[in-house]
């Protein structure tokens, strides 16, 4: 009898949770904001699935753990500038990207297009007149600097000469000698030292055909990654090294062959097993909006949803990498027309242009508010050089037509970014976070005793730090110096605080809210190591 009661209660629990979810949705938000589904029937089914979340193991994300490289301006854009023949089109692309508020360019630096004819040969003799193979990339780097944009350089596409069998194993197959690749990435990183902020080592190594006509190989990729990491850091110790962007896939057919690959969770764990933890600063992942909107909160590791980075974060925490961030290398929804003759129609989902324009800001907003361990998010993609690929589904991720006619998503993202108030959301944020506005004389101090090796310090009275945060409580972790500060929250009365190197709870409220903070140095010194915003006191 007791067993029957237990079984009956077990069956009732999801229904009870389902009822609670319906009530909360009707009172506080729409079902779309919980499920990412637009149609009422699909919303009802999704809410029932959502009620099962508490019965699954939840990812361990450690939201208050300090994370490096997570506080940069998050708005990045994928571009194909190396494929443009006319210089004005490169310039127009970068100009429009910057005008929309994006601050990063993710751009390929193909090995086969730079060290073209043989090892150490950086001359392009494919056309007359011959020219330096660096010329095009020098122009791209200069354009980014001109418009105040940082670069993520993707280092991939080996030349045929790097393999004894040429392209027999595919044009993406790794080189026979990993040191040849190491020499190439060293050449790039040394040439652009201090000018390129970040380097991505390969792309989508967990799916076909990015590892060539052979099964994907996480251990083999890790060896390549570690070689590249060592050589990049030799050339530019300050450069940020990203893994190849892991593709979203639930597949376990390791290839080769179309639509094959290794589940990115498995691939990442096998990378860790092979020693990858010592060989990257940032985990790069692709996070497409495929079958539901980015508001989908169902936790289903067997489904490809926008929430998949939560599981990758869980793996990073389990492997001792909680201090490293995830960057989203490619993110967008596919606005393919309703034409089944288009190659791979429906393979990337299908949304309208209006939905694409709504979903992109929602994706950024969710990551900013809920995932303090996510850094740069790169929209996929700005435009293609021509419309020759309009018979392929992937073409319809574009933001702008080849003739530079903007689509609705361009205006939606421009309005979102330019209207955004940079804000600290719940989590621990480092002293270099993009939402922090320093005024007066501040310096960066390298200190192994700091949380992540550095903090910001002011010594002259009158130096200020201003920012907006959203939450219930705020804690300042200062540097080791002693001094006195004045803290003003919104239009409230300023309060004096003695700073002696210990964390200070600067603010606490009974309920979450949005608050403006101004910290002023009155005397002595003040160091800012981190700021922690709490969702609950």
Predicted segment positions?
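Aromatic-rich peripheral "rim/lid" segments of glycoside hydrolase catalytic domains that contact
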Residues: 31-65, 205, 338-362, 366-443, ...
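Glycan-recognition surfaces in beta-rich domains, encompassing non-catalytic CBMs
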Residues: 417-537
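Hydrophobic faces of well-ordered beta-strands that scaffold small-molecule active sites
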Residues: 73-79, 105-107, 151-153, 199-201, ...
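Substrate-binding cleft and catalytic face of glycoside hydrolase catalytic domains
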Residues: 100-122, 127-258, 290, 333-336
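Short, low-complexity, charge-dense intrinsically disordered segments
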Residues: 1-7, 11-26
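Short, acidic/polar
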Residues: 84-97, 181-188, 261-273, 360-364
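N-terminal carbohydrate-binding accessory modules
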Residues: 30-104, 127, 142, 233
């Amino acid at each position: 009898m007791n067993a029957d009661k237990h079984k009956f209660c077990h069956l009732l629990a999801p229904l009870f949770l389902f009822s609670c979810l319906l009530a909360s949705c009707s009172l506080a938000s729409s079902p779309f904001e919980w499920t990412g589904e637009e149609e009422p029937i699909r919303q009802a089914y999704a809410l029932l699935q959502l009620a099962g979340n508490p019965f699954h193991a939840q990812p361990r994300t450690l939201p208050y753990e300090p994370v490096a490289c997570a506080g940069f301006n998050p708005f990045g854009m994928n571009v194909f500038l190396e494929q443009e023949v006319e210089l004005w089109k490169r310039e127009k692309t970068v100009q429009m990207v910057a005008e929309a508020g994006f601050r990063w360019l993710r751009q390929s630096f193909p090995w086969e297009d730079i060290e073209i004819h043989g090892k150490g040969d950086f001359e392009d003799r494919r056309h007359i007149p011959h020219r330096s193979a660096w010329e095009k990339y020098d122009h791209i780097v200069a354009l980014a600097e001109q418009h105040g944009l940082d670069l993520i350089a993707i280092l991939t596409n080996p030349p045929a000469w790097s393999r004894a069998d040429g392209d027999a194993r595919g044009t993406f197959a790794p080189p026979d000698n990993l040191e040849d690749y190491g020499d190439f990435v060293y050449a790039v990183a040394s040439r652009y030292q201090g000018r390129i902020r970040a380097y991505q080592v390969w792309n989508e190594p967990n799916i076909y055909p990015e590892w060539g006509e052979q099964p994907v190989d996480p251990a083999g990729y890790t060896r390549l990654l570690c070689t590249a990491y060592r050589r990049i850091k030799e050339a530019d110790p300050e450069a940020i090294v990203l893994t190849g962007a892991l593709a979203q896939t639930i597949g376990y057919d390791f290839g080769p062959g179309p639509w094959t690959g290794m589940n990115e969770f498995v691939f990442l764990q096998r990378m860790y097993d092979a020693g990858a933890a010592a060989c990257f600063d940032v985990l790069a992942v692709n996070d497409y909006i495929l079958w539901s909107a980015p508001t989908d909160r169902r936790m289903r590791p067997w489904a490809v949803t926008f929430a998949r980075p939560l599981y990758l974060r869980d793996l990073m925490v389990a492997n001792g990498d909680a201090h490293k961030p995830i960057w989203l290398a490619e993110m967008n929804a596919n606005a393919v027309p309703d034409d089944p003759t288009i190659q791979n129609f429906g393979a990337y989902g299908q949304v309208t242009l209006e939905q694409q324009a709504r979903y992109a800001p929602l994706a950024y907003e969710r990551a900013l508010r809920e995932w303090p361990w996510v850094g740069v998010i790169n929209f996929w993609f700005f435009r293609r050089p021509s419309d020759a690929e309009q018979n392929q589904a992937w073409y319809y991720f574009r933001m702008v037509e080849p003739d530079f006619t903007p689509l609705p998503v361009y205006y939606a993202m421009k309005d979102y970014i330019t209207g955004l108030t940079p804000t600290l959301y719940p989590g621990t944020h480092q002293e270099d976070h993009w939402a922090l506005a320093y005024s007066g004389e501040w310096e960066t101090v390298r200190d192994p005793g700091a949380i992540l090796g550095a903090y910001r310090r002011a010594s002259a009275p009158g130096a200020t730090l201003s920012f907006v945060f959203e939450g219930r409580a705020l804690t300042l972790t200062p540097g080791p110096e002693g001094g006195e500060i004045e803290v003003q929250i919104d239009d409230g009365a300023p309060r004096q605080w003695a700073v002696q190197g210990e964390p200070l709870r600067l603010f606490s409220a009974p309920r979450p809210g949005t608050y403006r903070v101004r910290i002023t140095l009155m005397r002595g010194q003040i160091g800012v190591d981190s700021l922690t915003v709490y969702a609950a006191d």
